[in-house]
Design a protein with these regions (language model features):
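Low-complexity, intrinsically disordered segments enriched in Ser/Thr together with acidic residues
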Residues: 101-124
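Short, solvent-exposed loop/turn segments enriched in Ser/Thr/Gly
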Residues: 40-46, 111-112, 125-128
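A surface/secretory-pathway sequence property marking extracellular, secreted
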Residues: 68-95, 162-168
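Low-complexity, serine/threonine/proline/glycine-rich extracellular segments that form mucin-like
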Residues: 39-76
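Bacterial N-terminal signal peptides that target proteins for export
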Residues: 1-11
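Extracytoplasmic/periplasmic copper-protein system
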Residues: 27-33, 39, 135-196
Length: 196
């Protein structure tokens, strides 16, 4: 049973990795690099920008990400060639901004922008609307995910909003055992009193 659970978990993680790799070729993505997000814990969330803007492939010069008030803390990690800032509005929403200090991220290069965060207190799926600027051109990653195409939105979305799943906080076994102990009712083998 333990082996089956391990095999299922490994297969699921592998498929998720393949899905992320496929998505990274076209859209702004969020990566956790093998570490799940747990409610009310700290972790690292990485925004990946896989290309520039428009048919001319302009370099990315500015990135702006919005985090709702559910997020408890967020601080961009240092990225060479970029300066970052965080502004918190009165309603608790955070705006993370990265500005290129040079020519920006070329169209042919992939850029990672890691953020140290304290995950929201409640488990759930959280959107992180993100705007990618290439000079005056904008790629606005904020389209909602819908089950199928409808009159207002195509499927899949042209500019899907990056989002992350936050799991319920993991419970740990107590460090010291107290109280009553279970009694084994398994038959004993061998001589009387043996506990093989």
């Amino acid at each position: 049973m333990r082996f089956e659970r391990c095999a299922i978990a490994t297969t699921t993680a592998t498929l998720a990795s393949l899905a992320l790799a496929a998505g990274a070729s076209a859209h702004g993505t969020l990566n956790l690099y093998g570490k799940n997000a747990f409610a009310n814990k700290t972790g690292t969330l990485t925004l990946t920008i896989p290309h520039g803007c428009g048919p001319d492939g302009l370099s990315t010069t500015k990135i702006v990400m919005q985090l709702s008030s559910a997020w408890q803390a967020a601080k961009p990690n240092a990225v060479a060639g970029w300066k970052s800032s965080v502004k918190r509005a009165a309603n608790g929403q955070r705006t993370l901004t990265w500005l290129a200090t040079g020519s920006g991220l070329p169209n042919a290069e992939v850029g990672d922008f890691p953020i140290t965060v304290r995950w929201p207190k409640k488990a759930g799926t959280y959107n992180t609307p993100t705007a990618q600027y290439c000079g005056t051109q904008l790629m606005d990653w904020k389209d909602p995910f819908n089950a199928a195409a409808d009159g207002d939105l195509p499927y899949p979305a042209n500019y899907p909003v990056p989002r992350v799943r936050v799991h319920a906080a993991a419970t740990r076994a107590p460090s010291a055992v107290t109280g009553s102990f279970p009694i084994s009712i398994c038959p004993l083998h061998g001589a009387s009193g043996s506990t093989q």
